[in-house]
């Protein structure tokens, strides 16, 4: 593997990609789910593609994606606009067609040489997604930054940064799929976008009908936890959950939970427990984990159009005192995670929108120890095909402070899940030790496995 101290990425000056045709000049309101303080962030995504001459016929990926992006913006024209702030900090989209920031780049490296450096927490992210000065604000800035970097092997890396108030992961996928379809020759997206953010406005009058631990300050928390850690001391590391890890974890849960427990539930319970142990939290302190739950689909009964690309999720929180979470078997945490997720339905989402309006769009609570997890393994980023086939990796590239993203990853032998974590450096070492301990096969199982493979 090459030395990345000598990696050279050459970038052309950024340009603004505008819609290929004239689009409406208007102002659009965000939903009350979009317009919350915790979504005023930029989310980075990376997608890595091999050269595929049999499919792309030596086309230039930068040219193909640039042209397709411009055509897709005719349909998704609000993304070419700018956010403005109205009375009481209410966000609106000025659909002025100013455009998306686009960067063409090249790097003297192959995908093979990059190896796992493209995986979360992606130490080379700043090379493949350069933060141009003045581009990363929430108000009056481009809503998307896209950098396409061509590699010497013929492959390329598409990295982007999204203003989260505009879309969630499912909404971003709709936009990326539209670009990909047009890059492959389509005249229009197969799923037409739907704005209709009024579908997730607060009710009139607003009324909070559910408990929302994710927005409530916990009482009696100590100041020695994650929330007060020196941000300069934070480190990122990713952890892999494959067949072996999941097998060991499943052996630790009670029989009545096995058939109803998802991989996401089990990993979340494991991370919550190990993280709490690693942070040495006061046993009497309340600790929380929130699971981001998509409102789309039959399970949650939220009726949204197929092409709706706004934020449509909530993150109900499980809460426990640190002592029982750390001392009880894994099934304790698992049951709390499952119960929290089960609270998500249309009424819960409506109650969130009402709470945000009544309380001035608060951020999720940061008191005490808090972890937020988002399952991106089934979003579909890995299916986005610009004409070069499927990406070798696609998804979020790092954790964001309290938020960890689960991403699909295939190592040399199997499909698994990669989870980036962000913790103080001392806690990260303890977290790794706790995770290794809880996912370690018992010695008798190792011996049995060796006997079965030798027969």
UniProtKB/Swiss-Prot annotation:
Induction: Slightly induced by ethylene. Its EC number is 2.3.1.-. It comes from the Eukaryota. The keyword Phosphoprotein does not apply. Optimum temperature is 20-37 degrees Celsius. It catalyses: butan-1-ol + acetyl-CoA = butyl acetate + CoA; hexan-1-ol + acetyl-CoA = hexyl acetate + CoA; 2-methylbutan-1-ol + acetyl-CoA = 2-methylbutyl acetate + CoA; hexan-1-ol + butanoyl-CoA = hexyl butanoate + CoA. Optimum pH is 7-9. It holds the Pfam family Transferase. One of its GO terms (biological process) is alcohol metabolic process. Gene3D superfamilies: Chloramphenicol acetyltransferase-like domain. Signal peptide: none annotated. The fruit of cv. Royal Gala exhibits a high ester accumulation, whereas the cv. Granny Smith contains low ester levels; this influences strongly the ripe apple fruit aroma. Belongs to the plant acyltransferase family. This is Alcohol acyl transferase 1 allele RGa. It comes from Malus domestica (Apple). The gene is AAT1RGA.
């Amino acid at each position: 593997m090459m030395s990345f101290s000598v990696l050279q990425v050459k970038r052309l000056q950024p340009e603004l990609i505008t819609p290929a045709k004239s689009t409406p000049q208007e102002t659009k309101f965000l939903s009350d789910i979009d317009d919350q303080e915790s979504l005023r962030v930029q989310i980075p995504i990376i997608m890595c593609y091999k050269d595929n001459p049999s499919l792309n016929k030596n086309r230039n990926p930068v040219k193909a994606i640039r042209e397709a992006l411009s055509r897709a913006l005719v349909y998704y024209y609000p993304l070419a606009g700018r956010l403005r702030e109205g009375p009481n900090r209410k966000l609106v989209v000025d659909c002025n067609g100013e455009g998306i920031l686009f960067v063409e780049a090249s790097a003297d490296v192959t995908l093979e040489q990059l190896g796992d450096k493209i995986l979360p927490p992606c130490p080379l992210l700043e090379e493949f997604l350069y933060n141009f000065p003045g581009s990363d604000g929430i108000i009056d800035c481009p809503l998307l930054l896209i950098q396409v970097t061509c590699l010497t092997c013929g492959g390329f890396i598409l990295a982007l940064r999204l203003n989260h108030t505009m879309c969630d992961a499912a909404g971003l996928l709709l936009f990326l799929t539209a670009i990909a379809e047009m890059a492959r020759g389509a005249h229009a997206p197969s799923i037409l976008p739907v704005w209709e953010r009024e579908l997730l406005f607060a009710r009139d009058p607003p009324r909070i009908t559910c408990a929302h631990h994710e927005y409530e300050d916990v009482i009696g928390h100590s100041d020695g936890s994650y929330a007060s850690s020196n941000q300069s001391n934070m480190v990122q590391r990713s952890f892999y959950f494959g067949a072996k890890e999941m097998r060991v974890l499943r052996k630790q849960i009670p029989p009545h939970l096995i058939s109803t427990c998802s991989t996401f539930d089990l990993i979340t319970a494991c991370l919550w427990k190990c993280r709490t142990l690693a942070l040495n939290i006061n046993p009497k302190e309340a600790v929380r984990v929130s699971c981001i739950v998509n409102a789309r689909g039959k399970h949650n009964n939220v009726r949204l159009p197929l092409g709706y690309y706004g934020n449509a999720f909530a993150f109900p929180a499980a809460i426990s005192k640190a002592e029982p979470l750390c001392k009880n078997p894994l099934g304790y945490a698992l049951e709390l995670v499952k119960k929290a997720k089960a609270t998500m339905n249309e009424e819960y989402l409506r109650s969130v929108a009402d709470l945000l309006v009544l309380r001035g769009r608060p951020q999720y609570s940061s008191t005490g120890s808090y972890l937020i997890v988002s399952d991106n393994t089934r979003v579909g980023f890995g299916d986005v095909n610009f004409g070069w086939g499927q990406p070798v990796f696609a998804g979020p590239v790092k954790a964001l402070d309290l938020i960890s993203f689960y991403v699909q990853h295939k190592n040399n032998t199997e499909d698994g899940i990669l989870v980036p974590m962000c913790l103080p450096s001392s806690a990260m070492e303890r977290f790794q030790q706790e995770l290794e301990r809880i996912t370690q096969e018992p010695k008798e199982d190792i011996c049995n496995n060796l006997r079965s493979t030798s027969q």
